[in-house]
Amino acid sequence: MKHQYFLIIALLFLFSGLSQSGKVMDQLTLDSKILKGKRKFAVYLPPDYDTSSRSYPVLYLLHGYTDDQTGWIQFGEVHHITDKAINNGKATPMIIIMPDANTGQPGYTNALSGKWKYEDFFFEELMPHVEKRFRIKRNKRFRAISGLSMGGGGSFLYALHRPDLFSSAAPLSASIGPQTVEEMKIFSYVDYWGYKKSNYNKTDYERFNKLNNPLNLVNQADLKALNSVRWYIDCGDDDYLYKNNILMHLKMREKGVNHEFRIRDGGHSWTYWRTALPSVLEFISQKFH
């Protein structure tokens, strides 16, 4: 009986060691000169971060419209899902950065008006800040980007604008921007596409698309640069954004861009994105190793 007791204790210690937990902080801030104020962001640190001195790969994980830096934590269960993927050996230990792109005005683009430059903030202030503040490996091979909906569009945008910075990009249920002038007007009241303006015209539409529409950016980009990024595109068959994601798949295939494309059962929901995240973590980890 005594031997059985010690065996049980030993097994408990063993399994507790195998199921280590990472750490999440969701109210971190940095001062932004570009956006003129404090900006919030969240971070996931892997289980062994506090007990090691090593540096880690990084995933920039972007939230969707109406959410903020806490979205992936509160609704996406990023902490639990990433812990499980790391402990199961499906994902390499990594740091995940989740910035707020809702405060002030929503979106990941630079506004057409020039008054709000979120993309500049992301590359010129956020990335240098977090990669200095945390033990992050600062080169393309160990940097990935993903996001859902508006954040899926943002991950397309950033990897297409700066393929030199990311080894992998995994847009989920991506919103890739307005396909008509009328669509631009739908979100004009929240400045979603650039700046508050109720009478968007063809010139605005063409200007926005040239700068920010992934369908156009694929055409403009160098094929070798695009293929230096590993692409993973995922959208539900009941998602209202499925058409544009299929168009991106077809455009990339036509251009000769290597990519993985998934249409799975599901809609535009956290249930869908929670089931997508493990595959994203496994996919980007293939390059991190």
Positions of predicted regions on the chain:
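Hydrophobic h-region of N-terminal signal peptides that target proteins for export
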Residues: 10-19
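Positively charged n-region of N-terminal signal peptides that target proteins for export
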Residues: 1-6
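Non-catalytic cap/lid and distal C-terminal segments of serine-dependent acyl enzymes
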Residues: 20-289
